[in-house]
Amino acid sequence: EVLSDGETVPEKSGVKKFLITGGCGFFGANLSARLLERGHPVVLFDNMSRKGAEPNLAWLRGLGKPEVRTGDIRDAAAVADLVRETRPDAVFHLAGQVAMTTSVKSPVDDFMINAAGTVNLLEALRQHRPEASLVYSSTNKVYGPLEGVKLVEKERRYTSPSHPHGVREDQPLDFRTPYGCSKGAADQYVLEYARTYGLRTAVFRHSTIYGCHQHATFDQGWVGWFCRQALEQKAKPGAPAFTISGDGKQVRD
């Protein structure tokens, strides 16, 4: 059963306690919902700054009793208190600055959230909960523009004869844009804390995630944004046209 706020989880009970940073965002909310449905105690850590966080939290509270901690990943003391007080068995680190365009406008904020914020969490785990597992949500941007991969333009899409099923995760890293650099730095710190300090960490390099509860915008979550724009065009003849960058043949995994 789902444990109420404040109850402790027996270390060997088999019921795992999960901490999700960015827990009220698109990815975090969907993951939290699945864990709550399976009876796990879940702690959500979010600064509630992004559009959609409040309705996502309301949805989650209709599914169970998540423990909610409002705070900022940039606040090292708050993150340390979070880990020390909640003692999670596993952490999904999903909090972050998610738009490349925002990183270009505000590179310092982007770095402090994505890179420094991740180190704050790693240090908190190292000091207070080294046995916990950490899964980090990275990005395909760490691979850069893939300049060495030849692309062939077809009628409806681009293809890569040398990589028909996409590039492998051992593709050399090539950080580009402030966003790629901040996420790439965090990506490598997560792996290095496993090598240097023995933390249990893993990195997922996601690309073009979309789905329910996303609240997509033009510069982040573009599949959802395109779908919404297309529906609005259909529902409102004469609505302003929307812009597709490039030729529309780009392919993501």
Feature roles, as predicted:
Residues 2-5, 22, 37, 71, ...:
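C-terminal substrate-binding subdomain of Rossmann-fold SDR/epimerase-dehydratase oxidoreductases
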Residues 2-209, 214:
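N-terminal Rossmann-like NAD(P)+-binding domain of SDR-like oxidoreductases, especially those catalyzing
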Residues 61, 224-227:
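Intrinsic disorder/low-complexity segments enriched in polar/charged and small flexible residues
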Residues 148, 184, 197, 209-225, ...:
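Glycine/proline-rich active-site loop of Rossmann-fold NAD(P)-dependent oxidoreductases
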Residues 193, 226-229:
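A short, amphipathic alpha-helix embedded in the catalytic core of nucleotide-handling enzymes
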